[in-house]
Amino acid sequence: RGAIVDIDPFGSPSRYLDCGIRATCHGGLLSVTATDLPVLHGLYQAACQRRYYGIPVRTEYGNEIALRLILGCIHLVAGRLDVKVMPLFAQHNMHYYRVYVKVLVRTDPEDNMGYILHCKSCGHRKTQKEQNHSCEVCGKKIESAGPLWIGEIYDKAFVDSMLPKLENFVVSKSCEKTLLKYQQEIGMPATYFTLDELARKMRSAPISLEKAIEKLQKAGFKAGSTSLNSSGLKTNARIDEVLRFFQN
């Protein structure tokens, strides 16, 4: 078995996960890349369900849903083999999604599978174990993405260990900024708002990301930026609470 195993096919990695997990030693690193973006973004929901055992919802944060669908699929395949996978890191660009997990040859007592619920009427979103049919904010129909991974995507110790090593490599300055954003995301709720999305709902010019974070933190909420979108805002505040604070 290998200490580092890389699955990087053209298209979906799902058919190779069983072999990839079996080929990784206890404590080893498995990296998985997906390039079938139209499927993960919800253009072909039936294909997504066949490949990743879950369906997406088309939203502003579709890239996060895609990463969580991939992690959820890996978790389900690993569970069948009595193996635990622990997400360490994830990255994306215009052409692919890539996740890194630690493989542990033992059963996983934690259940980090669930759904992202998204209301296309008011914009409310949340994660939970079960599906709902109506939005708790506006009462209208709510859509469900999943089942997918609803736990942490980034491991704090893994991300922290990378930062001091940057000086040993020739990398761009944006690399450090991105890693610092990963640090901020640890412990934050899944999904994010975009400033443009909030501005449309308020019918006003977008507020700056720094101001938005500061305002929510002063009000007692968790708030921070995300590596998944340069104008993305992660917070545990509901959409109605966010809009109320920004409109005042």
Regions found by a protein language model. Give the residues of each.
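SAM-dependent transferase fold signal centered on methyltransferase-like domains
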Residues: 1-248
